[in-house]
Swiss-Prot record:
Assembly and binders: The complex is composed of two ATP-binding proteins (YkoD), two transmembrane proteins (YkoC and YkoE) and a solute-binding protein (YkoF).
Membrane topology recorded in Swiss-Prot or TrEMBL: Multi-pass membrane protein
KW Cell membrane (keyword) present: yes
Main function: Part of the ABC transporter complex YkoCDEF that could transport hydroxymethylpyrimidine (HMP) and/or thiamine. Could also transport other HMP-containing products. Probably responsible for the translocation of the substrate across the membrane.
Species this protein is from: Bacillus subtilis (strain 168)
Top-level lineage group: Bacteria
TM region positions: 7-27, 32-52, 56-76, 110-130, 232-252
Classification via InterPro entries: ABC/ECF_trnsptr_transmembrane (IPR003339)
Pfam families xref list: CbiQ (PF02361)
Protein name: Putative HMP/thiamine permease protein YkoC
Family per similarity comment: Belongs to the CbiQ family.
Gene: ykoC
Annotated keywords: Cell membrane, Membrane, Transmembrane, Transmembrane helix, Transport
């Protein structure tokens, strides 16, 4: 059984993420992104069924990036140190509360962006997302089905690489060891992969044309996606949670 977040229309989900990213870009206090990040993580873990271990594993790079932003803003911030905002002295570097606040705000903003992105990626089928863009956002079917076909080709290209590697071994080619040798071996794989991709794309295009695909928007769909009440409830709930985070931040700021 699919979790609630998996059932939301992909376009509505993307619109909610985009609105949150835009609004967070204009929030400079550290309390709003911190509160909103906690809400995002709790909501995704409860409503998407994502394992905590998997979430933490993908969060590690963004934690490192966020810590780098906090450190950079605290050490190299432009706000001058005064007796009112002075925190401590680290050798020749004076750390003040204003620069630390800016750094924490940037760090939590990065974590919010990453959490929203992972929520979308982990709970959205790419094929359904492209179909939703065609049906709800009037995206060109030619572009959408081209992207879908390219996405379907990715596993095939992986199999092609394995076949080329096995063919080289049969013909006496030495196995690549080390990063430099593997990078140089890519040159031998590029032309066969490119030729295979062109043949697959040509066959796919001919098959689509033979079945009557013209790229027109006036067509029927095997799988129809719609925006229903559940999707609007999700969109409004996300905006309300963001507004609630902002109101909570006002209480902390005061």
């Amino acid at each position: 059984m699919k979790q609630p977040l998996h059932l939301i229309n992909p376009t509505v989900k993307a619109a909610a993420v985009f609105c949150c990213v835009v609004m967070l870009s204009f929030i400079y206090n550290p309390y709003t992104p911190a509160c909103f990040y906690i809400i995002i993580v709790a909501g995704v873990l409860l409503a998407a069924g994502i394992p905590l271990k998997k979430w933490l594993l993908f969060t590690i790079p963004f934690l490192i990036l966020a810590f780098g932003c906090v450190w950079t803003a605290a050490v190299f911030g432009k706000v001058p140190t005064t007796p009112d905002n002075f925190l401590f002295q680290a050798g020749p570097i004076s750390i003040n509360s204003d620069n630390v606040s800016v750094g924490i705000s940037l760090g939590f903003r990065i974590l919010c962006f990453s959490a929203l992105s992972m929520m979308f990626v982990f709970t959205t089928d790419p094929i359904l997302f492209m179909l939703s863009l065609v049906q709800q956002c009037r995206l060109s079917p030619k572009l959408a089905y081209g992207v879908i076909a390219g996405f379907r080709f990715l596993p095939l290209l992986k199999d092609e690489v394995q076949l080329i590697q096995q063919a080289h071994k049969i013909r006496g080619g030495a196995a690549e060891s080390g990063i430099i040798n593997k990078i140089s071996a890519l040159k031998r794989y590029t032309i066969p992969l490119l030729a295979s991709a062109i043949r697959k794309a040509e066959r796919t295009a001919l098959a689509m044309e033979s079945k009557g695909f013209t790229g027109s928007r006036n067509r029927t769909y095997y799988r129809t996606l719609s925006v229903n009440r559940r999707d609007w409830v999700f969109f409004c709930l996300v905006l309300l949670l963001f507004a609630g985070s902002f109101l909570v931040s006002l209480c902390f700021a005061s």
